[in-house]
Amino acid sequence: MRILQFTVDCPFPPVSGAEIRNAANARALASMGEVLTVSLTGAPAPSPPPNIRHRIIEAARGRGLWGRRSPHPTVHMMPDDELAEADAIWREFSPDLVVVEEIPLSQLLTLAPKHRARTVLDQHNIDSRTVADRIAGLTLWQQIRDWRQNRRKRAQARDADRRAAAMADQVWVCSQTDGALLSALGPVGDVRLIANPIPDETVLSLPIGAERYRELSLCFIGHLGYFPNIDAVKQIGRGMVPRLTASGRPWSITVAGRNPRDVVRGLCTKHGLQLIENPPHLPDLLGRAGYAPIPLRFGGGTRIKVLEAMAAGLVVCATEKAVEGLGLQAGRHFLSSNDAGELASKIVDLAKRPQAAAEMAESGRTFVRDNHSSAAIEKAIRQAIAEMPLHRTG
């Protein structure tokens, strides 16, 4: 089997959430045949995994996907030269299956009928939900001032989700919640759950012991240019820091991730958070912390940062939004509250019972190992592809 995978960024080496999912999918697909991954941004991967080749759309080199104001809130409206190059690669490689990453690249699905290849739309999020969340996070004045524009953006995003899902032979979602959100937008065909992966399975060997959880050592990891994560850092600084300080105990919070915006730098300086930009090796950071605060209020999909923290043995302390779609049990697998200050108070209380914290960390690790390992993802992808029709029906 020959498999063509279109991605926004080069997934090798995987760093951010989207790259981590794309890389895991590529590895699973490579167990079934030759994989060519084609990206719109970044440079060609110097050493992709076995049975995977990588190249970029040369016409897009240096442009940046969202470098200019887009006429659409979620779709990258590809210039003619980019679309023509993608078409030529598709024709030359002659794949049996094409996997397209998310709505931004959904215009590529329009090429499928003339090539008669089976197609998969891999939805990392339900983008119309993310757009709605972003608008809901605006101030009341901003919502009123721009209500016509915001209404148009919501409608465009919903329509893009519906059309892309209808064009693809199969849609992959990372949670049952996202599958339900997509189905609520209109009729969809074959929707399959392909779970998000543990980014680095070596963290499963990090020790879990009571001593690790006595100290108030917290670590938040995420792409620091992504607005839901920026908001989470705000919640950590404004809501959690005062409660931790009021406990009278020493505490530390590390914020680490790619491409932090200036607002993140300012928040870390103001609230005494340690900022580590573009960390080279996450397991070291994770191994030094006992707790992972994840007070997310916006976004979709399932949080790779939750899986990563649990696999590494941290006690995850999260909002309902942060663990949405994962099937975790509050009080058993993680600490739960939708208020950042209350999350901090729960961490302080649990740190007084370090053995109970270790047991919660072990429960979280077991859950993600059983449901989000590379073996589990490969099994799900193999089954999904095996049950696709052999040829496009459209």
Can you say where each PLM-predicted feature lies in the sequence?
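N-terminal subdomain of nucleotide-sugar transferases
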Residues: 1-55
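A charged, aromatic-enriched C-terminal amphipathic alpha-helix characteristic of glycosyltransferases
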Residues: 76-77, 355-385
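Donor nucleotide-sugar binding/catalytic pocket of nucleotide-sugar-dependent glycosyltransferases
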Residues: 150-205
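Acidic donor-binding loop of glycosyltransferase active sites
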Residues: 169, 287-301, 312-315
